[in-house]
Structures are given as C-alpha cells and as structure tokens.
Amino acid sequence: MNETQVIINLISADKDAMPDALAGLACSAAIAVSDIPVEALFSEVRVARINGEFVVNPGRAALENADMDFIVAATKNDITMVEGEADECTEAELVAALKIAHEAIKVQIEAQERLAALVGEKALVKRPLPEIPEHEEIKKRIEALASADIYALARSASDKDTRKTRVDEIKDATKAALLEAFGEEVMAEWAATADRYFEKLKKQVIRDVVLSDSLRLDGRKFDQIRPIWCEVDFLPSAHGSSVFTRGETQSLTSLTLGTKQDQALIDTALNPHDDKFILHYNFPPYSTGEVKPMRGPGRREVGHANLAGRSIRKVMPADVPYTVRIVSDILESNGSSSMATVCAGTLALMDGGIQIKAPVAGIAMGAIADDKGRMAILSDILGDEDALGDMDFKVTGTAKGITGTQMDIKIDGMPYEMLEKALIQAREGRLHILGEMAKAIAVPNADLKPHAPRVIEFRIPRDFIGAVIGPGGKIIQEMQRQTGTTISIDEDTDGGIVAIFGPDKASLDAAYGQIQAIVFIPEVGSLFEGVVEELAEYGAFIKFKGKTGLMHVSEYDHRRIENIADVLKVGDPITFKILDVDAKTGKMKLSRRAITAKPDGTMPTDEENAARANRGGGGDRGGDRRGGGGGRDDRRGGGGGGRGGDDRRGGGGGFRGR
C-alpha cells in the first residue's frame, strides 16, 4: 500500500490561539476532500477544565487557569488518542473530559463530511487499493510448521532474550522447511510474503494465548507488575540520582541544579519562553542490545521526555530558585521506559532535596481484544505486548490523582467502560509502584547535596537595579569574578529580585554584602563603624558599608581640634553617628562628637545635634568628587548598560543543551 503524507504548515495565527488542537482536523479534512481511501475520518480537540468547567479549545490566556489540559483525537465512534496533563485529577474526571471532547469531535467530522459532499465525486469516489499478492499454500504450510512451537513459546513464561532467540529459531526452521518444499525460485519470489505470514501468525497465536488461557508472555497475571528494584544516591557527584528497574527496563537518572542562566529557551511559534525545568530522555542502542549510530534526539526521545517532564512538573514547588535538569539514561529496555523515567526522575528529585509536593509514578497499560468480544487489560506491558496489542495507555500520577497521560488505540470499538477499567487498573498498579519507590526514599531529603550550588534570593528597590548592574554590566560582572558566584536580577512590579548562586556560604555572603552595600540607604541618627579613607584640612572622609561621608573637624570632639590629622590617620577605625543626609545629593554629615560625652559628663541631646546639622559647616569638598555616597546616578557613571538582556544576568555559565 502506498504511503500517505500530509504536511501541515502554520501560516499565521492569533497569539491567543492554540493551533496544535486544529492540526488533526486539518489533516483529516485534506484527506476527506481527496480520493485517498481512509477507513474513517477523525478530528481532534483540546479539552480543559477551567474554574471547574470543561472548555473545548480554550485560548492560551484561559488555559493558564486550567487544572486539566488534554488533546483528544477520535473518529465518530471511538477515541483513538489522548495526551495531556492534570493537577492530580481522578479517573472519573478524565473520562468525563474525554466524553465532552468526543462530542465536539463528532461535530467537526460532520463538517468534514459536508465539505466532501460539496467537493463531489472527486472526494466521494476513492481510488482502489492495490491488491496484496497472496500465496495460500505457503500460508497454510507456515501455519502447520510454526503454530505449535509459537504456542509453546507463548506459554513458556520466558524472558525477552530467550523469547527472541526462540522466535528466530522457529522462523529459521520454518524458512528451511519452506525452501525444501517450494524450492529456491518460488521462495525468492515470495520471501516477503512468507515473512508477513509468519509475523501475522505469531501475533495471532500469542494474542489467543492471552485471551484464551489468561497467560502473558512472561507468565504474569493481567494486573501484575514486574519486580521493582530502585536505589537513590547512586552517583556520588550528581546533585541527585537514582536507578529504577522494573523487570528488564532500567533508567539511570541524574539531577543537576543550575542557575537562571541555564534556563532552556523554548522557541515555539507563538509562545517562546525560558523554562527552568528540563527533562532529557536518552535511549542508546545498547539498551535493546543493538548496534546503531548515535544521532540527535528523535521523535521517541522528544516525545518520551515531554510526557515524563509534564508529569513530574505538576508536583514541582513553585519557589525553586534553581534551573532543574533531569536526565534519564535508559540502560536496558523491555517496555515502559518512559514510565521508568517518571519514577526515576521523582526519586532523583527527592534524593536531591527538592521538596516536591508528592511522589509521581507511571505505568503503561495495554489491551488485547478480538471480534468475539473478548478483551484483556494488561498492566505494565512488555515491549512485545505493546507491539502485538491494541492499546498503549500510559498513565502517571501521585497517590491522589493523575498528572499525565498518553494513549494510542489501534482498534475500533474501545468502549468507555473498558477505558474506565483500564484507568482503575492503572491506579492500582501506580499505587503499588509508589509503595516500592517509598522503600528507597519516602520523602524528599531535607537538605541539598553538599556539592550542590547554594542560592539566596532577596529583593532590592527598583531604583538600585541599575546601580548593582553597572555600566554595561561592569559592576555585577566584577562582583561575580571576585566572589565566584553567579548573580541574576529579575524585575517585577515590586522591584528587583536578586538571586545569588555560589559553591558555599562564604561566597554567597561576600556577594550579598557587596550588593547590600550598594543598595544601603543611610538614616539620620544611625550609628555605624567605619574606616578613615582620606584626610583633608576641614575633616575626614569615612568609608562604611560601601558609602563615604564627611566628618568635619568640628564634629570629631567637643574640644577644638586645629588639624584633623592630629587625631586621625588613614585606616583608623571610628564609630560615629549620621548627623544629616542631603535629600538631593545624598551627601552625609558624620559626627563622633554626637556620641561623645561633653566636658560636664552629659551626652549631647538630639536637639543639639540637629541644630549643628542645620547650621551646616560640614565643609564642601567640591560636590560630586565623592558624591556623598548613595547617589544612584553618580554610581552608574552616566548610565550605560540598560536593564535587560545579558547585562542583567551578569554573565555566568553552566550547562545548556541536551
């Protein structure tokens, strides 16, 4: 049969529109108006629950408030695909969402049918399918040769490697018998057909064993989960790590905590944004015992990472100051590797001290049905059960409810009752898996790993953002160089949010102190300790908390001092009180006299100090030479580097990419 390719291009869109929910409708409509044969028209919609009400195809702004978000595809009669996420919804709520989506899809399919009718004969009369060549004698001979052996294998409760080896042996023996019976010339012509017959027979026999004997390939019951082994703190240098093994599927997952500079740019057509939660899924060829070239991420890697990531994201705390990166390396695979990634990712987060709301586990469900009305719902499916089955239904969630799901149904006639049964069975399996995970770690560790980066966050006034950054980012970059930290500043309506990332407390304290010195606003009457920075005829310039103020010679003591150099020298420590701060220039008058007893033993009153401050006499040193400290414009040195882009982030480094 010829392949059919439909290419969908987004030409233009309203920024509030969600074009992904319309792609299926466009695809099916294109086929509907062509002469390409199709078993059934389909469509897809997004269904979300917003403020307790289900909405079909909501806009992007409305979707921000949704606690359920699913894309559903279906024909007129049956659901065929589901993918989405939820804030721990129940199984019944998911089924309710599917039913609402299905009703909307039926309307869209009817519109396609009317469109095809308008096109007329070109759309209504489909081209005939080419006949597939058949050879009944070869087909019967394969059934006679291989059926019994395949049946015995299906009942043998074997592992993946043993099963594969035995299938190859049966196939080779069958080929040899066919070659002897029909000769080389015939078999050379019908080799592909013979392979097709063998694969179809294998599928039929194994499916019949499941339905008739209630026996799975590895000997499990329908609702039985494979043995689980998991461990945390597996990698000594990672910020968190875990190994999760379920049967013959294993994920080694690591957690890395980075800075805001490490956020991933999600460059979508309508909603480009930075994401501080990243999950990467790697499926190397050795995980299935194969030799293949290592290329970039394919659909499998992207799709599995997306499903696992959206499932775990639902339990991430909102106040995590780090960029969180989870990497799942599949070491061996025999089905459900994406669900192993969910489990291993959760364990790694808890091992790393990330305070997730609740552990998340995932399970892959399958189904096998026949035209006699028999159906088996299988928990924790194998790779072979996925290939020969009729459904692949991945469900993730906490003990409370569902956080993510992905379902593909390959047959017609999957009633809602069976979907509900699959969801209930999936919940039972999920709870079992969560129990096994709890044996390794039940709650997140209280602290981060010793070698994980530390971070502090605090706010600064909006007027000081430019002063901290400096012209062209000069000040913040020098601060990072001196302290060995990475500093980022984000701006919101309330000012600036500063995040400092460093390897230890000392580096954080050093950077924090420098920033506090810049944003420090001195208050009249406050006591401070400072250091003499420079002497002049009329007084001393004192440095404290990153600021500089003038102590006039008359404010050193109650007795007359002719030369300030007689009592102070550069580098001397000194305690003083701020006598006055000029509201316009920020220049400060400092006084030791204000905190020194008078000759009669009494202390100066606030009124006396205020009177001296108002009289002036502090001496003027040429105005802006020192600027009195605290003037934002002087510190910025004439502006420079604006508030956005790289200057705000102050450089830094870290991982980026897959």
Question: Which stretches of residues belong to each language-model region?
Answer:
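Flexible, glycine/charged-enriched surface loops at secondary-structure junctions
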Residues: 1-4, 39-41, 108-127, 161, ...
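Glycine-rich, flexible beta-strand/loop modules in the N-terminal catalytic cores of phosphate-handling
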Residues: 1-4, 10-12, 17, 76, ...
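Conserved phosphate/anionic-ligand binding catalytic regions in large, soluble enzymes, centered on
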Residues: 17-35, 231-255, 334-354, 466-476
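Long, charged amphipathic helices and adjacent flexible linkers at domain junctions
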Residues: 119-133, 432-458, 505, 509-529
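Flexible hinge/switch segments at interdomain interfaces of large molecular machines
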Residues: 1-3, 73-75, 143-144, 280-286, ...
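Extended amphipathic alpha-helical scaffolds
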Residues: 124, 128-271, 456-467, 475, ...
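Single-stranded RNA-binding regions, centering on S1/OB-family and related RNA-binding modules
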Residues: 451-453, 464-658
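Mobile "lid/hinge" segments at catalytic clefts and subdomain interfaces of large enzymes
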Residues: 34-158, 349-446
